[in-house]
């Protein structure tokens, strides 16, 4: 049983579209069990990997997916303002690139651009993508701006390949959240 170490903390859990999205479900449970109020955000691509219903059932409020289905005219801004921390897990190359470039093309990236809260980015992608110069430059840009990066692990990837790029395990991400 986890201590209530995150009691009263508002954490926005952003899930982007990679196979590792399934790990966000367990991470959500760990955060809620520790007392956090978890507001989930999913990209349209993430919905190909896990269902909104699953994350909504485990989180503290329904999943946010689009800027256009909320009664609040600026839902991403309100969510970003009340966040104590934003966690992006998994963070795909697209989301990392958009965030580094300041492009807010969906609810997730708009929330990242609108927040002043600390942000923890947990990359997950195939080794070739992770090692690509543009991804590494975007990671370096985010680090320079004070974004916390939890490096991906080395291990078995989708398709059976082995290499760097696997999303950190939910317990490891949770431990990092506790430090922030």
Residues of each region from the PLM?
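A cross-family phosphate/adenosyl-ligand binding-site feature
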Residues: 1-120, 126-180
